[in-house]
Amino acid sequence: DLKIKNLTIVGESIGAVLAACVSVQAPKQIKKIFMFNPYDYDSYFGEGVQRGNFFAKFILFHVGLPIVGNLFAALENKFILKNIMSGGFFDSTKLPNDYLDLLCTSLNKKGYVYHFRSVLSQFNKKNGVKALYKKVKVPLKLIYGSHDWAKESNKLETKDLLNADAYETINNSGHFSFLENTKEVRDIIKS
């Protein structure tokens, strides 16, 4: 039996989807969840990330290919990561270099390529998360960046499945609002 009570869970992107999943598994422990830019709409490998820019589309298309995709994924480096991630920002100058350095520490670890490709290939709208959304019973706030990768139809579908009254929008923000609009995110969580 969990001793944790009145927990607030905040997640962005895949983390937002995980917040919803945890709330279904442990509703008595969860007071509220905040879902920022939930990444729940892919119909093919890395679709959402590919919406960011041409560079991301080119790289992820090739990473998603059978067999040769492993080679493309193994070539990932700071330059590639930065150019893919910049497609998730309204203002790409807000992508911190030290954060990129931190992410790059994983690139050469054993199993990285396998796990990276596995997450993007399994994380799609057919993985059951949409059905799980209907089971979320805890209070929640759904928030999107004004320039998130999700299309309006994706946002409305998620809102409806979660039975949310509405979703909030952070202006001048892409998919990575935690990094790009820290103050606005903080204010939403504190509200």
What do the predicted segments below correspond to?
Residues 45-48, 70-134:
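Conserved alpha/beta-hydrolase catalytic His-Asp/Glu region
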Residues 136, 142-144:
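Short beta-strand/loop motif that positions the catalytic acidic residue
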Residues 154-175:
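Catalytic histidine neighborhood in serine/cysteine hydrolases
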Residues 173-186:
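Catalytic histidine-centered segment of alpha/beta-hydrolase-like enzymes
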Residues 146-151:
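Acidic catalytic loop of the alpha/beta-hydrolase fold
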Residues 1-7:
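Conserved acidic catalytic loop of the alpha/beta-hydrolase fold
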Residues 11, 15, 19:
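Gly/Ala-rich beta-loop-alpha elbow adjacent to hydrolase catalytic centers
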Residues 24, 32-67:
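Flexible "cap/lid" loop of the alpha/beta hydrolase fold
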